[in-house]
Amino acid sequence: MEQQQQKSAAHVSKLFVCTAVDCKDEIEEKFERSYVSLQQQIAGLSDKEMHDMLTQIVCKEKQHEEISIGFLYIILTDPAMAPKTYRDITLVSRDGMNVIVANLTLLVAEKYAKLTETARRQLIWVLREFVKHQVLSVENVIWNCLRQAGGGDVSHKNLFLVESLLDIFIEYRAWLEAIPFLVQSSVYSFVRLIEDHANPALMPLRQKEVKFTISLIRDRFQDIIPLGRDFVRLLQNVARIPEFELLWRDILCNPKSLHPTFNGIWHLLQIRTSRRFLQCRLLPEMERKLHFLASSVKFGNQKRYQDWFQDKYFATPESHSLRSDLIRFIINVIHPTNDMLCSDIIPRWAIIGWLISSCTNPIASANAKLSLFYDWLFFDPAKDNIMNIEPGILVMYHSIRNHPFVSSTLLDFLCRITKNFYIKNEDKIRLGVYNSLKLILDKQVIPNLHPLFESPKLDRELRNLIRENFREFVSPVANMPQSIYPATHSIQAPIFKKEADQRMLQSENIDVGSGAFAANSGTISLVDDDNKIAITPVESSERETEAVFSDDDGENIARCNKNDENTDDDDDLPLSKVRLKEKPVPEKVELPDAIAESFEIFVTKRNSFTWEAFLKDFRTLPASTLDETQLNYVISNTVLILRETLPQQNVFSESKTEEKYLAKSISYPLYGLFRFLYENEDKSKKPFQTLLSEICERLSETGYLLLYFMKIHCKLQTRKNAQQSYQFKTTVYRQICEATDEKIGICLVRDLDLLEKENTTIYLWLLPDIYREFKTIAINNTDLLRITLRCVDAKNVRDIMYSIAQGKLTIFKQDGLIDCIRESLEYETYEQFCLWQLIQAHDVPLKCIQDILPELEAANHPEALSHLLLLLKNEEPTSEIIRLLLSREAKTRGDPFVTSALRFWCQRCEEKLSEIIASLLTSKYPSSSPNKRKRPSKGSSAASSTPSADHVLNHLEHYRRSCRHGTGTGLYVHDMMQRALQSAYSHSNESTKKQFSDLFALAAEDETTAVGRRGGSGRGRKQPVGKKDSNNHNAGSKKNSDVVKTIYSSDENSSEEDWSKHKITQAAKKRKKAINDSD
């Protein structure tokens, strides 16, 4: 008995709180094992002996990790030994504590809830030490601690963590501000947490949070802008706090005071908040449970899971605010795959409906509804994802019949929020809601809006409100049909949906270091790649979809098989019994004999061979043979089969070289259409053209799959018959474009955009073929270029440059390239750097793009200026380049770009550069009219890029100022430059002379003449002298020899000007001696 007690006592963990029924998992065993192993090795050793022994042991990777975790265990469980143990770690660790940080990150993400009170306090202590000593990657641990600071939780345990993290951020503010992502996460988290700390007992903490958050927002607003629209939603909840009220005033009335690039509240509302910030407001454990509910629980079996979730996370009054966080996460992060959409797993809208309908707090309920429709208000079909608006319409659509209260409250809220959310931009909000509803109908997320908007179960006031707000989607009153539910149609079109991510976010574990979900062997990136194509096939008549928010176990589901007439008016039917009706079986239509047999075989066998056989018969069929009903029957069934036979995932080949994979990837019926078009280019009859048009319109991926097919088909055919050349036929693609009645350039860009979003690897693989076969469209095409630049990484750029160097790919031609560069100035920095890499790979001469030099601004176009400066370094100065450079606007502090170019040219060809600039300056002062500036003629084409005299003098003056310790001023001592400066002086007015007095002082004068004293033009070089200048010399400087003098109007002690004076004086002596010798 005693042995059993000792054995059980030995297993009591100091790190984790365990009950009698808890089993240790891998993480817990790993920490316990490492601690025991370390204790066995260092028991009875002095500090020196321990360090010596451990230093030898940690050379091996496994032992190093074990010892590091053992020390971490001691720090977390023994506060008294923590400082000494931390010193021991710093002596023993050989990887900058990387192993300790990684394991601590894992511990916080997976086991924080099970840590003892002592361990949680020690965790804060060690984090403070890590931040204090700038340990690498400690921000990963901090970020996961922020995730553990849950919303809607005012327990002592949670408040301790919140306040501890806040103290670390305040104390080490400089460290925090150096990590923009952590700045964003902390601001987003604390603005959300402040909402929960309204209790008077929490006012000191709340005030500290407010002071820190407001300070960080104002100081780092450039980092706050990417938080986007959900940050605005959180700010609304704390707007009555005085400090936030002042912030709101600045955002609305004085946005530039926060940051020069900030344009106001609409700027934030147009930015979609990253999934990472929505994720950081959910506890990791809560996130795993939510993923399980949305990916593994069948419809009808969810009630017990929802009850457990309710008891676990919604038990307190403060926890109601958590519902908004959950809804935003479900909408923006959990995007089910096609397989899940087709399965009997509980859909997203049902979970959201349960969260809203079970909320009893009116404020939390309003916030939850706003969370549901938030993306509707700013929806842009070009860049937003239909999966973010799909749950809102589906929860209303599936509730209207049997639970109209849910639908009516949501519809009322949508109508009112559209008008009142942002009155100043009501038209833009309405446009967002209109775009949402239009796309919902276009993609057939629901068949139509009549059952929802025109339901008799809505009260009259609400129906009038709907008509007022959504008149485009409501039929006139006089024409309202008797039955407002969808009628039965014999021909069904497939339903299309877009997803942000086709991969299923169903994992139970989270890789906290990289912020990605891990599902078994794969990882799901949180990088947003919206608008990928995903399909929901039409449901068969054999299967039903159950639409419920919750359900009681053991309930008899046979009631759901009643006919429509028995359930339409059943207002008492609970939400748990809501179901979709069965889809009607399409009625068969008799077809002409010429195609009836082949079409029947195709519908039955659904393979590429039977499809091509039908196309052969159908292609020559005249329009008079088919009526509209028959044609629609053929089209709808054809499109449905083509869609269903395409694989929902892995549409493309797994290998780019192995024939079996390549051939398999184009073996589906849709590719049979492409093969048929490839082999039959003759003009087809009208029914065939109509069929082709409908396929292209309903299957948006048709275009890029055709491009993929031609690449594979040509590759395979060439391998089979190397003697015959197989062409990448652009005429086939033109047929597709003609069928959709769009220009080929527009179609090509659209299809390649879809392809890149679907599969970047295949897009880059096809790129050389696209530029080769569609060269007139693709080369210098900025839209196609932008698609490429947004998806490439360093390796992709390298591969593209290889193709360019080998002559396989040409992206640019010299004519028109400058327009591409102009448009690229608005691109992201990385995209612009990649662009310049590709330009350099094409060996584009500078003369083709040099005209853009005067247009570039130092503050707005640093990327282009950086690369152009490198190109200039490889060029010799020419009159044209110098003219363009000096045409650039000279700011108050000068133009560093021009100065840099002049300096490195001075080192190589100083005299040539001096002559070019002098010639340009002299040309501004014609000798025939010394007192009059030359004006460019009205018909001069180069007038706009020709620098004025003031431009040239400005750049020369700023260049002079940049010459420290005399380096580079040799530019001014050459004869032509001296004469040019003297000429400029003699033709300048008094203000110009005063402005550039130091520059003019670098011009030497003759013994016999002086500029400014005589207006005539003598033989020698002239020196500008002012009356005041002669009085500025030191009284001690009395030696006025016959040597040429130089005059300085400011800072006579400057080393650069002393050097210049000395050098110019020497040059003047040499010239004088040469003249005397010649005499």
From Swiss-Prot:
Tell me the residues on which Phosphoserine occurs. 1049-1050, 1054-1055
Check the record and name the Pfam families matching this protein: HEAT_Ints3_C (PF24566), Ints3_N (PF10189)
What are the Basic residues biased-composition ranges? 1062-1073
Q: Where is this region: Disordered?
A: 539-574, 925-949, 1010-1079
Under the heading InterPro entries, the entry gives:
HEAT_Ints3_C, INTS3, INTS3_N
Q: Where in the cell is it found?
A: Nucleus; Cytoplasm
Q: Where does the UniProt annotation place the signal sequence? A: none
Alphabetically sorted, this entry's keywords are:
Cytoplasm, Nucleus, Phosphoprotein
Query: Looking at the UniProt record for this protein, which Gene Ontology cellular component terms does it annotate, in alphabetical order?
Result: cytoplasm; nucleus
Q: Where is the composition biased (Low complexity)?
A: 938-949
Recorded family membership: Belongs to the Integrator subunit 3 family.
- Function of the molecule: Component of the integrator complex, a multiprotein complex that terminates RNA polymerase II (Pol II) transcription in the promoter-proximal region of genes. The integrator complex provides a quality checkpoint during transcription elongation by driving premature transcription termination of transcripts that are unfavorably configured for transcriptional elongation: the complex terminates transcription by (1) catalyzing dephosphorylation of the C-terminal domain (CTD) of Pol II subunit Polr2A/Rbp1 and Spt5, and (2) degrading the exiting nascent RNA transcript via endonuclease activity.
Subunit-structure text: Belongs to the multiprotein complex Integrator, at least composed of IntS1, IntS2, IntS3, IntS4, omd/IntS5, IntS6, defl/IntS7, IntS8, IntS9, IntS10, IntS11, IntS12, asun/IntS13, IntS14 and IntS15. The core complex associates with protein phosphatase 2A subunits mts/PP2A and Pp2A-29B, to form the Integrator-PP2A (INTAC) complex.
This one is known as: Integrator complex subunit 3 homolog
